[in-house]
Amino acid sequence: MATVNVLNWKKEKVGSVELAADVFETPVKKEVLHTVVQWQLAARRQGTHMTKTKGLVSGGGKKPFKQKGTGGARQGSSRSILMPGGGTAFGPQPRSYAFVLPKKVRRLGLSMALSHLQKEGKLFIVDSMASEGKTAELNKRLQAFGLKKAVLVDSVVDDKFNRASKNLPTFKYFPVEGLNVFDLLKYDAAVITKDSVAKIVDRCSLEKA
């Protein structure tokens, strides 16, 4: 169990907190992270693509030309997949790309992503995310940490902080419930509040899976 500093927004130490080893010191396996990211992205896909089969194309009730004497192959319908404007054989149809991934694997992936940031020194614990709701103020805070893009995680959503962060496209703010592997890997760093640490540990607990 590692003890890390709790910082204010001037990057000054204001306390300390212990990080559970089974969540923030998990050995990283790329194949697990890859699987979890695939699962997330698959669930986001709309899957509304569709091509018309022979039975859905309009027209084609009449034989397009006589059986013999044309020098070409015989055809019984202009809707045939062999005809220009005809149907498509085995084309994409509406479907869901989502698949089931065990909770244990999802929780393990989240622990690995957090452990990776912790190992790289890109995980920061702050005392609070209370804000005046001004983007300029928040931008100044983030510059003190030298961050160009990061996820900002709070135990509960602060409306003013949320409003200020929406004008910063390279930063993403959400509560612990929204914490996910894809965003942790996409952004350079993570800033989480001291109060959210316990909730994160609870989310990543393999005993609950």
Curated annotation (Swiss-Prot):
A Pfam family the protein falls into: Ribosomal_L4
Protein's GO biological process: translation
Cellular component terms per the entry's GO annotation: ribonucleoprotein complex; ribosome
Keyword list, A-Z: Ribonucleoprotein, Ribosomal protein, RNA-binding, rRNA-binding
An example Gene Ontology molecular-function term: rRNA binding
InterPro entries: Ribosomal_uL4, Ribosomal_uL4-like, Ribosomal_uL4_dom_sf
Region described as Disordered: 50-89
Reported function: One of the primary rRNA binding proteins, this protein initially binds near the 5'-end of the 23S rRNA. It is important during the early stages of 50S assembly. It makes multiple contacts with different domains of the 23S rRNA in the assembled 50S subunit and ribosome.
Subunit structure, as described in the record: Part of the 50S ribosomal subunit.
Family to which the UniProt record says this protein belongs: Belongs to the universal ribosomal protein uL4 family.
Protein name: Large ribosomal subunit protein uL4
Organism field: Bdellovibrio bacteriovorus (strain ATCC 15356 / DSM 50701 / NCIMB 9529 / HD100)
